[in-house]
Amino acid sequence: MKAESGQTSRRILCVFPRYTKSFGTFQHSYPLMDDVAAFMPPQGLLVIAAYLPDEWSVRFVDENIRAATADDFAWADAVFVSGMHIQRQQMNDICRRAHDFDLPVALGGPSVSACPDYYPNFDYLHVGELGDATDQLIAKLTHDVTRPKRQVVFTTEDRLDMTLFPIPAYELAECSKYLLGSIQYSSGCPYQCEFCDIPGLYGRNPRLKTPEQIITELDRMIECGIRGSVYFVDDNFIGNRKAALDLLPHLVEWQKRTGFQLQLACEATLNIAKRPEILELMREAYFCTIFVGIETPDPTALKAMHKDHNMMVPILEGVRTISSYGIEVVSGIILGLDTDTPETGEFLMQFIEQSQIPLLTINLLQALPKTPLWDRLQREGRLVHDDNRESNVDFLLPHDQVVAMWKDCMARAYQPEALLKRYDYQIAHAYATRLHPSTPQRASKANIKRGMIMLRNIIWQIGIRGDYKLAFWKFALRRLIRGDIENLLLVMVVAHHLIIYAREASRGHANASNYSIRLREAAVPAE
């Protein structure tokens, strides 16, 4: 579906802001690969670009790949921006540059939807999802593209049905430069974890696209150059279990038709381990990774954060069950909880050893607006606004002790030998049970060339020039002896980033939360 403009032509520059370097964007991996420069295409901005009227010209710039230029701004009638809290500084900077050309700037996305007061300099704020606010913004720009005298806020009251969503405008993006693709099947999550802003922003009743839409989008992504993997960005892939069961057979057939070109990944709650019928279909659809918000192995803490659904199955048992279907578990972990003790760090390290999960996003607790956690801490007077701190939460343990615990866990969890040992375990117990499709599409000349470039870069940058070459060669030789080059490449692309980033974090050179941004980083010159 597209909006209408009454035949008026406009030129819209869509700019996606650069990410602050973080654990989850894998910047340290890009030099190992062929022409990769960014993590994944921004769904929201590309959907908006596709929704704009046919009469409008649209240009898309992802500043993780290249910066918007003076020529881009000179071409445009208006600028659209979208992003998350951690991109706040960069969003404000784009606004300032656009205003240098006297262009009106509209901001949408999750950050402004949660905190419109963060963005006083933007001309238009789009609060909420695609819907009537989008149509109002389009109508306003159809009528007039001069900057308004004061900020105008459009708030979505009537969301567009997801079955009417257009295919994201992948053709505008340099898809081959992304580490992986992204796709959205549903929006919303039925659970109310205390720290999570998803239910407040997108609702508790998951809204859905049709399986046919998803298949069409996957076909378009391949046409536009997405390769390797596609990540379902749904807040919870099994938020509607019936819908997941409806979609999965379509994905299985699509994979067979297209030669299993893409591995799939998603986010889901741990109770997926109780649904073997879903896990078996996911295996057949070539799902290879699930991000599970385990948060903590402490049952008392899980109950306190209203994450009781993580206790429907013993955590270690759930992880092993998921892995038995060939699916690697990636885990979210939070430190700084009210239930933490001085021994929590050691408890976490024991859990990592027992679970053998290689990749864990270990964050300090951060209170996000529009969450029950924010409301509770505000009542308790425990929200802290201090740009010298790693979190806006007044922990019950001393702040410096919690930060030191986080640094220690990062350093130990991603020590090269320990990390690669966990990957050895995954290869033997999870990767061994997944599908191993052999198709002409996977063995294409382009894929073989890409693999050879990656192998060359990995051997040169890690095996010869790197400072953990002994651990690397112990791991690599085991893979090479078995002819297992694919897993060698897949593991080292991820592991290298984790090792380098963890070193930066343990030295205090990285934020202790992927969801925070310090005030000094968010500051921009006043206009």
Curated annotation (Swiss-Prot):
Binds 1 [4Fe-4S] cluster. The cluster is coordinated with 3 cysteines and an exchangeable S-adenosyl-L-methionine. It is an enzyme of class 2 (transferase). Induction: Up-regulated in an EcfG-dependent manner under a variety of stresses, including high-temperature, acidic, alkaline and hyperosmotic conditions. Its cofactor is [4Fe-4S] cluster. Its EC number is 2.1.1.-. InterPro entries: Cobalamin-bd, DUF4070, Elp3/MiaA/NifB-like_rSAM, HpnP-like, rSAM, rSAM_horseshoe, Tetrapyrrole_Bchl_Biosynth_MTs. [4Fe-4S] cluster binds at C189, C193, C196. It comes from the Bacteria. Belongs to the radical SAM superfamily. This is Hopanoid C-2 methylase. It comes from Rhodopseudomonas palustris (strain TIE-1). The gene is hpnP.
